[in-house]
Design a protein with these regions (language model features):
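N-terminal phosphate-binding or glycine-rich loops at protein starts, especially the Walker A/P-loop
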Residues: 1-42
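Short glycine/serine/threonine-rich phosphate/pyrophosphate-binding segments
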Residues: 13-18, 79-89, 96-110, 121-125, ...
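Glycine-rich phosphate/diphosphate-binding loop of Rossmann-like nucleotide-binding domains
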Residues: 15, 33, 39, 146-208, ...
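Short helix-capping segments at alpha-helix termini
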Residues: 25-29, 46-54, 168, 198-204
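Phosphate/nucleotide-donor binding subsite
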Residues: 50-94
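Glycine-rich phosphate-binding loop
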Residues: 88-107, 182, 186, 191-255
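Glycine-rich phosphate/nucleotide-binding loop
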Residues: 111-135, 139, 215-313
Length: 313
């Protein structure tokens, strides 16, 4: 297993990335391809006493900044850590690629270098939602597709369902459509047109409409919405954590589960190989969990599972 990590992406990279890799390699025998400025990375790994036959540094002299145009930057910076990461992934030299760098560049690279799985209308990104009773759900889409068609939301439900089952280990995930009321026929035109598709979808267990007040209870494991709505929900949840932390509740058993560092990042669901995006302010723990999520997606053959399911639709 070869896991690719962009060591230059993130506000605190490459130092925190190095610490995350150090923590992972202390208890793993999977090879980590660390993509970044070779001299700097060697110096940092040496300073932290990291020496492992499973550590492989790939030199990338350039990096894509947060404010650079994704498509333009990937084209003009072929030697950037993100561009080289996608090249290695496309060539099969690594089995997954993850970064806390430029989100747009990661999305463009996934869409045009790795490409969507056959039959997937639009890949999606999801965010994990902590539940009050201790479970974890997933919200899809959270920003990749601001405007959606009903058929796309129907597929997001399938992709989220597969993720809940094979990555979150939820045996029989329940799918809900985020809406302004529980009754069938509620909502805007998109929600009204999506409901019957989800209701007739034999690949999921659809419970119906789900109101915003039920996001954090156990009514649904997979919550489906367009990316515009999902991104607002995600940012509101993040703001709720910040407010709780400001009030001294950051270590509360429930609110602490909102912290991004506890999760491995956001996978792009529906592309041919595992691609993971992590928060730009990632610390060592976040990088470590990003590597662990990469490992799980590879071991579970998650992308192959999606491919198989979409062949049978």
């Amino acid at each position: 297993m070869n896991i690719g990590i962009d060591m230059m992406g993130g506000d605190f990279a490459p130092l925190e990335a190095v610490k995350g890799v150090q923590q992972y390699l202390s208890n793993s025998e999977h090879t980590i391809f660390c993509i970044g400025e070779e001299t700097l990375l060697k110096e940092l790994f040496q300073q932290h006493g990291v020496s492992s036959p499973f550590l492989h540094i790939v030199h990338a002299p350039d990096a894509i900044g947060y404010h650079e145009h994704p498509t333009k930057a990937l084209k003009e910076k072929p030697n950037s850590s993100i561009a080289i990461g996608f090249k290695l992934l496309a060539e099969g030299k690594i089995d997954s690629f993850a970064s806390a760098g430029n989100t747009g560049a990661m999305l463009v690279g996934a869409m045009f270098t790795i490409k969507p799985i056959k039959g997937v209308l639009r890949p999606t990104i999801g965010s994990l939602l902590p539940k009050l009773e201790g479970k974890t759900g997933i919200l899809v889409d959270v920003g990749l597709n601001a405007d959606c068609k009903p058929e796309q939301l129907n597929q997001f439900a399938i992709l989220g369902n597969l993720y809940a089952k094979h990555i979150l280990n939820i045996e029989n995930p329940i799918v809900g459509l985020l809406n302004m009321g529980e009754e069938e026929g509620k909502g805007n035109l998109l929600a009204q047109a999506t409901y019957p598709l989800l209701k007739e979808n034999t690949h999921i267990q659809f419970m119906g409409n789900l109101e915003g007040r039920d996001l954090f209870n156990d009514k649904a494991d997979v919550i489906v919405c367009d990316g515009f709505t999902g991104n607002i929900v995600l940012k509101t949840a993040e703001a709720m954590y910040d407010a709780a932390a400001h009030q001294g509740l950051g270590n509360d058993s429930f609110f602490s589960r909102y912290h991004f560092e506890n999760y491995g990042g956001t996978p792009i669901l529906g592309v041919n190989k595992p691609v993971i995006i992590q928060h730009g302010i990632s610390n060592a723990k976040a990088f470590y969990n990003m590597i662990k999520l990469s490992e799980k997606m590879i071991e579970s053959k998650f992308c192959q599972i999606i491919t198989s399911n979409f062949e049978n639709l």
